[in-house]
Amino acid sequence: MGRGRVQLKRIENKINRQVTFSKRRAGLLKKAHEISVLCDAEVALVVFSHKGKLFEYSTDSCMEKILERYERYSYAERQLIAPESDVNTNWSMEYNRLKAKIELLERNQRHYLGEDLQAMSPKELQNLEQQLDTALKHIRTRKNQLMYESINELQKKEKAIQEQNSMLSKQIKEREKILRAQQEQWDQQNQGHNMPPPLPPQQHQIQHPYMLSHQPSPFLNMGGLYQEDDPMAMRRNDLELTLEPVYNCNLGCFAA
Protein backbone atom coordinates (compact mmCIF):
# COMPACT_ATOMS: atom_id res chain seq x y z
CA MET A 1 0.00 0.00 0.00
CA GLY A 2 1.56 3.27 -1.10
CA ARG A 3 2.21 6.25 1.08
CA GLY A 4 -0.56 8.78 1.09
CA ARG A 5 -0.13 12.34 0.04
CA VAL A 6 0.88 14.59 2.89
CA GLN A 7 -1.43 17.47 3.49
CA LEU A 8 0.38 20.80 3.37
CA LYS A 9 -0.45 22.75 6.47
CA ARG A 10 1.32 24.16 9.46
CA ILE A 11 2.56 21.55 11.90
CA GLU A 12 1.26 22.41 15.30
CA ASN A 13 3.65 20.24 17.28
CA LYS A 14 6.75 22.30 17.92
CA ILE A 15 9.13 19.35 18.03
CA ASN A 16 7.71 17.78 14.88
CA ARG A 17 7.85 21.12 13.16
CA GLN A 18 11.53 21.53 14.06
CA VAL A 19 12.38 18.01 12.87
CA THR A 20 10.51 18.49 9.62
CA PHE A 21 12.22 21.82 9.05
CA SER A 22 15.65 20.26 9.48
CA LYS A 23 14.87 17.41 7.08
CA ARG A 24 13.27 19.59 4.42
CA ARG A 25 16.05 22.16 4.73
CA ALA A 26 18.70 19.51 4.12
CA GLY A 27 16.77 18.19 1.14
CA LEU A 28 16.29 21.68 -0.26
CA LEU A 29 20.00 22.45 0.03
CA LYS A 30 20.80 19.14 -1.63
CA LYS A 31 18.45 19.87 -4.53
CA ALA A 32 19.95 23.34 -4.95
CA HIS A 33 23.45 21.87 -5.08
CA GLU A 34 22.37 19.20 -7.59
CA ILE A 35 20.77 21.67 -9.97
CA SER A 36 23.82 23.95 -9.81
CA VAL A 37 26.16 21.06 -10.67
CA LEU A 38 24.02 19.25 -13.23
CA CYS A 39 22.76 22.31 -15.07
CA ASP A 40 25.72 24.66 -14.47
CA ALA A 41 23.33 27.17 -12.96
CA GLU A 42 23.99 29.93 -10.47
CA VAL A 43 21.86 29.19 -7.46
CA ALA A 44 21.27 31.30 -4.38
CA LEU A 45 19.08 29.92 -1.60
CA VAL A 46 18.12 31.86 1.54
CA VAL A 47 16.02 30.30 4.32
CA PHE A 48 14.99 31.79 7.68
CA SER A 49 13.59 29.56 10.37
CA HIS A 50 10.61 30.57 12.51
CA LYS A 51 13.14 31.79 15.10
CA GLY A 52 14.82 34.00 12.55
CA LYS A 53 17.84 31.75 12.05
CA LEU A 54 19.42 32.13 8.63
CA PHE A 55 20.38 29.26 6.33
CA GLU A 56 21.75 29.91 2.88
CA TYR A 57 23.39 28.24 -0.08
CA SER A 58 25.13 29.78 -3.04
CA THR A 59 27.06 28.46 -5.98
CA ASP A 60 30.83 28.69 -5.37
CA SER A 61 30.30 31.12 -2.49
CA CYS A 62 29.14 33.91 -4.81
CA MET A 63 25.99 34.87 -2.92
CA GLU A 64 26.78 38.58 -3.20
CA LYS A 65 27.30 38.40 -6.95
CA ILE A 66 24.08 36.48 -7.48
CA LEU A 67 22.09 38.89 -5.33
CA GLU A 68 23.55 41.92 -7.08
CA ARG A 69 22.71 40.36 -10.43
CA TYR A 70 19.17 39.67 -9.26
CA GLU A 71 18.79 43.21 -7.96
CA ARG A 72 20.03 44.75 -11.19
CA TYR A 73 17.80 42.51 -13.26
CA SER A 74 14.70 43.00 -11.16
CA TYR A 75 15.29 46.74 -10.88
CA ALA A 76 15.66 47.07 -14.66
CA GLU A 77 12.51 45.02 -15.22
CA ARG A 78 10.58 47.14 -12.76
CA GLN A 79 11.82 50.31 -14.38
CA LEU A 80 10.50 49.13 -17.73
CA ILE A 81 7.15 48.08 -16.31
CA ALA A 82 6.52 50.70 -13.65
CA PRO A 83 4.87 53.94 -14.77
CA GLU A 84 6.67 57.21 -14.45
CA SER A 85 4.27 58.37 -11.75
CA ASP A 86 5.43 55.65 -9.36
CA VAL A 87 8.62 57.47 -8.37
CA ASN A 88 8.10 57.24 -4.63
CA THR A 89 7.60 53.50 -4.81
CA ASN A 90 10.86 53.12 -6.72
CA TRP A 91 12.74 55.12 -4.12
CA SER A 92 11.28 52.96 -1.38
CA MET A 93 12.36 49.82 -3.21
CA GLU A 94 15.82 51.23 -3.76
CA TYR A 95 16.06 51.99 -0.06
CA ASN A 96 15.03 48.45 0.83
CA ARG A 97 17.53 47.06 -1.66
CA LEU A 98 20.40 49.07 -0.22
CA LYS A 99 19.34 48.20 3.31
CA ALA A 100 19.36 44.49 2.51
CA LYS A 101 22.77 44.83 0.90
CA ILE A 102 24.15 46.59 3.97
CA GLU A 103 22.77 43.86 6.24
CA LEU A 104 24.39 41.23 4.05
CA LEU A 105 27.75 42.99 4.16
CA GLU A 106 27.55 43.39 7.93
CA ARG A 107 26.75 39.71 8.34
CA ASN A 108 29.67 38.70 6.14
CA GLN A 109 31.92 41.01 8.13
CA ARG A 110 30.86 39.29 11.35
CA HIS A 111 31.60 35.93 9.77
CA TYR A 112 35.06 37.10 8.70
CA LEU A 113 35.68 38.18 12.30
CA GLY A 114 34.64 34.75 13.59
CA GLU A 115 31.27 35.86 14.93
CA ASP A 116 27.78 34.36 14.43
CA LEU A 117 29.19 31.05 13.19
CA GLN A 118 26.61 28.87 14.98
CA ALA A 119 24.03 29.26 12.21
CA MET A 120 26.45 28.26 9.45
CA SER A 121 26.45 24.77 7.94
CA PRO A 122 29.66 22.74 7.39
CA LYS A 123 29.60 23.68 3.72
CA GLU A 124 29.30 27.36 4.56
CA LEU A 125 32.10 27.10 7.10
CA GLN A 126 34.28 25.41 4.50
CA ASN A 127 33.55 28.16 1.99
CA LEU A 128 34.30 30.80 4.63
CA GLU A 129 37.58 29.06 5.42
CA GLN A 130 38.54 29.07 1.74
CA GLN A 131 37.75 32.76 1.47
CA LEU A 132 39.86 33.53 4.53
CA ASP A 133 42.74 31.42 3.18
CA THR A 134 42.59 33.26 -0.12
CA ALA A 135 42.54 36.60 1.67
CA LEU A 136 45.54 35.56 3.81
CA LYS A 137 47.45 34.55 0.68
CA HIS A 138 46.81 37.94 -0.88
CA ILE A 139 47.85 39.67 2.34
CA ARG A 140 51.09 37.65 2.61
CA THR A 141 51.88 38.25 -1.05
CA ARG A 142 51.41 41.99 -0.67
CA LYS A 143 53.44 42.03 2.55
CA ASN A 144 56.31 40.10 0.95
CA GLN A 145 56.23 42.43 -2.04
CA LEU A 146 56.50 45.49 0.21
CA MET A 147 59.32 43.89 2.19
CA TYR A 148 61.18 43.00 -1.01
CA GLU A 149 60.82 46.56 -2.31
CA SER A 150 62.01 47.94 1.03
CA ILE A 151 65.05 45.63 1.00
CA ASN A 152 65.93 46.66 -2.55
CA GLU A 153 65.67 50.32 -1.59
CA LEU A 154 67.91 49.80 1.43
CA GLN A 155 70.45 47.91 -0.70
CA LYS A 156 70.53 50.78 -3.19
CA LYS A 157 71.10 53.27 -0.37
CA GLU A 158 73.84 51.07 1.08
CA LYS A 159 75.57 50.83 -2.29
CA ALA A 160 75.39 54.60 -2.76
CA ILE A 161 76.85 55.16 0.72
CA GLN A 162 79.68 52.70 0.04
CA GLU A 163 80.52 54.43 -3.22
CA GLN A 164 80.50 57.80 -1.46
CA ASN A 165 82.75 56.45 1.29
CA SER A 166 85.16 55.03 -1.30
CA MET A 167 85.31 58.36 -3.10
CA LEU A 168 85.92 60.23 0.16
CA SER A 169 88.64 57.76 1.17
CA LYS A 170 90.34 58.25 -2.18
CA GLN A 171 90.20 62.03 -1.83
CA ILE A 172 91.61 61.81 1.70
CA LYS A 173 94.50 59.62 0.51
CA GLU A 174 95.28 62.00 -2.33
CA ARG A 175 95.16 64.95 0.07
CA GLU A 176 97.46 63.18 2.51
CA LYS A 177 99.87 62.41 -0.31
CA ILE A 178 99.96 66.08 -1.35
CA LEU A 179 100.46 67.23 2.24
CA ARG A 180 103.25 64.68 2.73
CA ALA A 181 105.04 65.92 -0.39
CA GLN A 182 104.67 69.53 0.75
CA GLN A 183 105.99 68.63 4.20
CA GLU A 184 109.02 66.92 2.69
CA GLN A 185 109.68 69.95 0.51
CA TRP A 186 109.40 72.26 3.51
CA ASP A 187 111.75 70.05 5.52
CA GLN A 188 114.34 70.17 2.76
CA GLN A 189 114.07 73.95 2.54
CA ASN A 190 114.41 74.31 6.31
CA GLN A 191 117.48 72.09 6.32
CA GLY A 192 119.00 74.29 3.60
CA HIS A 193 118.42 77.47 5.65
CA ASN A 194 119.83 76.00 8.85
CA MET A 195 123.19 74.93 7.26
CA PRO A 196 126.16 77.27 7.97
CA PRO A 197 127.10 79.52 5.06
CA PRO A 198 129.99 78.26 2.92
CA LEU A 199 133.40 79.62 3.72
CA PRO A 200 134.70 82.27 1.32
CA PRO A 201 137.78 81.31 -0.71
CA GLN A 202 141.00 81.82 1.18
CA GLN A 203 142.48 85.18 0.42
CA HIS A 204 146.21 85.02 -0.04
CA GLN A 205 148.00 88.16 0.96
CA ILE A 206 149.91 89.17 -2.05
CA GLN A 207 152.81 91.26 -0.98
CA HIS A 208 154.25 93.73 -3.32
CA PRO A 209 157.86 93.00 -4.02
CA TYR A 210 158.65 96.38 -2.68
CA MET A 211 156.74 95.75 0.56
CA LEU A 212 159.33 93.88 2.51
CA SER A 213 159.58 93.05 6.12
CA HIS A 214 161.66 96.09 6.78
CA GLN A 215 158.98 98.66 6.66
CA PRO A 216 159.80 101.54 8.94
CA SER A 217 157.15 102.99 11.14
CA PRO A 218 157.89 106.72 11.15
CA PHE A 219 157.65 108.26 14.53
CA LEU A 220 158.49 111.57 16.10
CA ASN A 221 160.61 111.61 19.18
CA MET A 222 159.99 114.77 21.11
CA GLY A 223 162.94 115.67 23.31
CA GLY A 224 164.43 112.23 23.28
CA LEU A 225 167.19 110.56 21.40
CA TYR A 226 166.69 107.97 18.71
CA GLN A 227 169.07 105.14 19.17
CA GLU A 228 169.85 102.34 16.81
CA ASP A 229 172.48 99.75 16.66
CA ASP A 230 174.27 101.98 14.26
CA PRO A 231 173.49 105.57 15.28
CA MET A 232 174.99 106.93 12.13
CA ALA A 233 173.41 104.46 9.82
CA MET A 234 170.96 105.72 7.27
CA ARG A 235 167.63 103.89 7.05
CA ARG A 236 167.20 102.51 3.64
CA ASN A 237 164.16 101.12 2.01
CA ASP A 238 163.74 99.10 -1.08
CA LEU A 239 163.55 102.21 -3.22
CA GLU A 240 167.11 103.14 -2.29
CA LEU A 241 165.87 106.30 -0.62
CA THR A 242 167.54 107.50 2.51
CA LEU A 243 165.49 108.86 5.30
CA GLU A 244 167.07 111.21 7.70
CA PRO A 245 166.40 110.33 11.26
CA VAL A 246 163.88 112.54 12.77
CA TYR A 247 166.10 113.35 15.67
CA ASN A 248 168.48 115.21 13.34
CA CYS A 249 165.82 117.80 12.77
CA ASN A 250 166.44 120.81 14.89
CA LEU A 251 163.40 121.39 16.92
CA GLY A 252 164.27 125.01 17.00
CA CYS A 253 162.91 125.44 13.51
CA PHE A 254 159.40 124.84 14.82
CA ALA A 255 159.87 127.49 17.49
CA ALA A 256 159.45 130.32 15.08
Swiss-Prot record:
Disruption phenotype: Partial conversion of flowers into shoots and a disruption of sepal and petal development. It is found in: Nucleus. Keywords: Activator, Coiled coil, Developmental protein, Differentiation, DNA-binding, Flowering, Nucleus, Transcription, Transcription regulation. GO terms for cellular component: nucleus. Residues 1-61 form the MADS-box domain. Changing A233V: In strain: cv. Co-1. SMART domains: MADS. Its main location: nucleus. Residues 88-185 form a coiled coil. Expressed in young flower primordia, later becomes localized to sepals and petals. Changing M120V: In strain: cv. Jl-1. Induction: Negatively regulated by TFL1 and by the C class floral homeotic protein AGAMOUS. Positively regulated by CAULIFLOWER. GO terms for biological process: cell differentiation; floral meristem determinacy; flower development; meristem structural organization; positive regulation of DNA-templated transcription; positive regulation of transcription by RNA polymerase II. Homodimer capable of binding to CArG-box sequences. Heterodimer with SEP3, AP1 and SVP. Binds AP3/PI to form a ternary complex. Interacts with the SEU-LUG corepressor complex when complexed to AGL24 or SVP. Interacts with AGL15 and AGL16. Interacts with TT16/AGL32. This is Floral homeotic protein APETALA 1.
